UniProtKB/Swiss-Prot annotation:
Catalyzes the methyl transfer from S-adenosyl-methionine to the methylene group of 24-methylene lophenol to form 24-ethylidene lophenol. One of its GO terms (molecular function) is 24-methylenesterol C-methyltransferase activity. It comes from the Eukaryota. It catalyses: 24-methylidenelophenol + S-adenosyl-L-methionine = (Z)-24-ethylidenelophenol + S-adenosyl-L-homocysteine + H(+). Its EC number is 2.1.1.143. It comes from Arabidopsis thaliana. Disulfide bonds: none annotated. One of its GO terms (biological process) is xylem and phloem pattern formation. This is 24-methylenesterol C-methyltransferase 2. It is an enzyme of class 2 (transferase). Belongs to the class I-like SAM-binding methyltransferase superfamily. Erg6/SMT family.
Length: 361
């Protein structure tokens, strides 16, 4: 073996060690390794076909004619992206404003804890996490409040991941996870002391339907807080660039059309809620929530090569590269939406279910 061959062989080994220690290692501490990437509940041989079906369905989100199919495709979306989210982002599938002097992890936790502080629950009370994902916010909120948290997600794979994480964190006594559609929740009327949703109800075809369900299961006098994805007052429908950005966000995040910020409170009032407080948590003086997306561009290219290699050798399912590429493009649209101020993923609305029907009339 000549010296040039030895050099390239050594370089390849060094690169391989770097990837597995510096890329795959940190991801494993988040709960998912690159070598474990899968299609969730979708069998490996069907990942690529499911991705194509998803992309075709959400090609023009606001023109979707069969809204009843949206929940099924949202389920497909989370089968496709959950492992990649955990590996590349963490267990909390949402954004938070940057906080000077704080890590992304701490900023995320504080953003989650604020939600439960707003609804003023006490230790031992039962609260609902509407669209809980793999349970990152649930665990932070249960630890902070000592309330019993019941999470619901439409995706069975996420249910299993959340239960695994809850047990590892020693929080399975406080955290329960249910597989179900938040448009038809399997809970009794007036059964929760509070509820929250963190960037989750944006997947509902009609916001009124999920708000009505949350209203139904809350006890009278209890509060609900939501961080909503919205277009802001800066969005101009006649601006082609604005439209491109918003459509890019919708397609890449399984959204059947983003709502305008002015529609959120009106929808909540329509189902019977009183509005306690409303604020865009992304507005100044809040630090940019998209900083982490911009900082992660180098990591994306690094991770994309990992995904390509794992897919080529058959470790990751075919179609994983397409999904990863879609998420990178979506991250660019999200960043542009944040920088231009036309989009916010954290329009906060705090609502209260009246003590009696007469109060809301």
């Amino acid at each position: 073996m000549d010296s040039l061959t030895l050099f390239f062989t050594g370089a390849l080994v060094a690169v391989g060690i770097y990837w597995f220690l510096c890329v795959l290692g940190p991801a494993e501490r988040k709960g998912k390794r690159a070598v474990d990437l899968s299609g969730g509940s979708i069998s490996a041989e069907k990942v690529q076909d499911n991705y194509k079906q998803y992309w075709s369905f959400f090609r023009r989100p606001k023109e979707i004619e069969t809204a009843e199919k949206v929940p099924d495709f949202v389920d497909t979306f989370y089968n496709l992206v959950t492992d990649i989210y955990e590996w590349g982002w963490g267990q909390s599938f949402h954004f938070s404003p940057s906080i000077p002097g704080k890590s992304h992890k701490d900023a995320t936790r504080l953003h989650e804890e604020m939600a439960v502080d707003l609804i003023q629950v006490k230790p031992g009370q039962k609260i609902l996490d509407v669209g809980c994902g793999v349970g990152g916010p649930m665990r932070a909120i249960a630890s902070h409040s000592r309330a019993n948290v019941v999470g619901i997600t439409i995706n069975e794979y996420q249910v299993n991941r959340a239960r695994l994480h809850n047990k590892k964190a020693g929080l399975d006594a406080l955290c329960e996870v249910v597989c179900g559609n938040f448009l038809q929740m399997p809970f009794d009327d007036n059964s929760f002391d509070g509820a929250y949703s963190i960037e989750a109800t944006c997947h509902a075809p009609k916001l009124e339907e999920v708000y009505a369900e949350i209203y139904r299961v809350l006890k009278p006098g209890s509060m609900y807080v939501s961080y909503e994805w919205v277009t802001t007052e800066k969005f101009k429908a006649e601006d082609d660039e604005h439209v491109e950005v918003i459509q890019g966000i919708e397609r890449g995040d399984a959204l059947p059309g983003l709502r305008a910020y002015v529609d959120i409170a009106e929808t909540a009032k329509k189902v019977g809620f009183e509005i306690v407080k409303e604020k865009d948590l992304a507005s100044p003086p809040a630090e940019p929530w998209w900083t982490r997306l911009k900082m992660g561009r180098l990591a994306y290219w690094r991770n994309h090569i990992v995904v390509q290699i794992l897919s080529a050798v058959g470790v990751a399912p075919k179609g994983t590269v397409d999904v990863h590429e879609m998420l990178f493009k979506t991250a660019d649209y999200l960043t542009r939406g944040g920088e231009t101020g036309i989009f916010s993923p954290m329009h906060m609305i705090l609502c209260r279910k009246p003590e009696s029907p007469e109060e809301s009339s």
